[in-house]
Amino acid sequence: MARIGDGGDLLKCSFCGKSQKQVKKLIAGPGVYICDECIDLCNEIIEEELAESGEVKWEELPKPMEICQFLDNYVVGQAQAKKALAVAVYNHYKRIQAEATGAPSADSVELAKSNILLLGPTGCGKTHLAQTLARMLNVPFAIADATALTEAGYVGEDVENILLKLIQAADYDIKRAETGIIYIDEVDKIARKSENPSITRDVSGEGVQQALLKMLEGTVANVPPQGGRKHPHQEFIQIDTTNVLFICGGAFAGLDQIIEARTGHGGTGFGARLRAVSERSTDDTFSQVMPEDMLKFGLIPEFIGRLPVITNVRSLDRPALVQILTEPRNALVRQYQRLFELDGVELEFEQSALEAIADQAMLRGTGARGLRAIMEEVLLSVMYEVPSNPDAARVLINREVVLENVNPTIVPREFTSRRSRREREEKSA
């Protein structure tokens, strides 16, 4: 039997207007009513919003081999670094998954966090690897520059600003930010200036390492939402860094000499064999790194202990740079071909031109990061001319264009259509 309101009317849902007879259930509140259909609709909207917010679905956590295969689509080479990162990231989020689902452990073992230290020269993919990992897992990602950090109270950025970048990347969703990834670049620049502790304060070196310790290990940090220096009286945001994965990267110039001195491969002493520069490989040397080498380099023991996973990225040779130009999904050649395609022009690179671009990047010592700058230089004149040339159909880049700065070959549209017509006739014959 339907209940009657004070005015004698049937009770209705305050949202959809359906009466009590038209729905299965009508729930009363202070002066309002909501039906079961509206409740179901609200649940659907909430689930959709949660899905769009990009929370990690722990039951779908990719396995290390799947992570490696995904990285292969975007990053060329670096097989060992990919393997180490895939395992470390998988174990990190598996640990969070176990805590989130409350999975019981037989002996109640508490799983510790394993942050990562990436060694390797500039332009070899350290930052790109971390960015690609975060994109695959759909977690917030922030990049911080260690060279700008100083101890609290000194001119420069506080270490808490790193967490502010992560919170901003998560659209101020603290729960989501607490499972994000932070990449701290140029971490070798915060090494203390000498191996022995100094009586003078090292505010941008050892002082920063000390300030980062609790954050790396896991603590509830107070983060000023507008930056702590200019707005000292603002309310702080609290964020727990226990489940934030930290990846630290740096070139560590000079570390190879420390490792060689320890392993006996250096050239010191009367009986030592002097190795030619061509025999030495920084990549092979970095693969033998030990915590004691990092200590001699200038990192404090507590900081090294909070980065248990140490791996290195290898220098990029000529074939690897050519692969970077052409093979990844967002390869540079594909990007520029797409730009020309928007103007209705086909862009074509000869193999010799790609090799010349790779050689130039190696000469400059900028690695993969320098490839775009070289491409811009090579294509500047043609990118200036082609949009105003309606007759241009195809642009051909060869070795001479790259090395001798000659103008590329622009094939007119009439010639291209005539050639394609001839090819069609040959096929039909």
From Swiss-Prot:
SUPFAM superfamilies per UniProt: Glucocorticoid receptor-like (DNA-binding domain) (SSF57716), P-loop containing nucleoside triphosphate hydrolases (SSF52540)
Residue ranges occupied by any ClpX-type ZB domain in the UniProt entry: 1-54
UniProt keywords, alphabetically: ATP-binding, Chaperone, Metal-binding, Nucleotide-binding, Zinc
Molecular function per GO: ATP binding; ATP hydrolysis activity; ATP-dependent protein folding chaperone; protein dimerization activity; unfolded protein binding; zinc ion binding
CDD domains to which the protein is assigned, alphabetical: RecA-like_ClpX
UniProt superkingdom: Bacteria
InterPro entries found in the cross-reference section: AAA+_ATPase, ATP-dep_Clp_protease_ClpX, ATPase_AAA_core, Clp_ATPase_C, Clp_protease_ATP-bd_su_ClpX, ClpX_bact, P-loop_NTPase, Znf_CppX_C4
Cellular component, GO, one term: HslUV protease complex
GO process terms (BP): cell division; proteolysis involved in protein catabolic process
Positions of Zn(2+) binding: 13, 16, 35, 38
SMART domains: AAA (SM00382), ClpB_D2-small (SM01086), zf-C4_ClpX (SM00994)
Subunit structure as annotated in this protein's UniProt entry: Component of the ClpX-ClpP complex. Forms a hexameric ring that, in the presence of ATP, binds to fourteen ClpP subunits assembled into a disk-like structure with a central cavity, resembling the structure of eukaryotic proteasomes.
Family: Belongs to the ClpX chaperone family.
Free-text function comment from the UniProt entry: ATP-dependent specificity component of the Clp protease. It directs the protease to specific substrates. Can perform chaperone functions in the absence of ClpP.
Name of the molecule in the record: ATP-dependent Clp protease ATP-binding subunit ClpX
Source species: Salinispora tropica (strain ATCC BAA-916 / DSM 44818 / JCM 13857 / NBRC 105044 / CNB-440)
Lineage: Bacteria, Bacillati, Actinomycetota, Actinomycetes, Micromonosporales
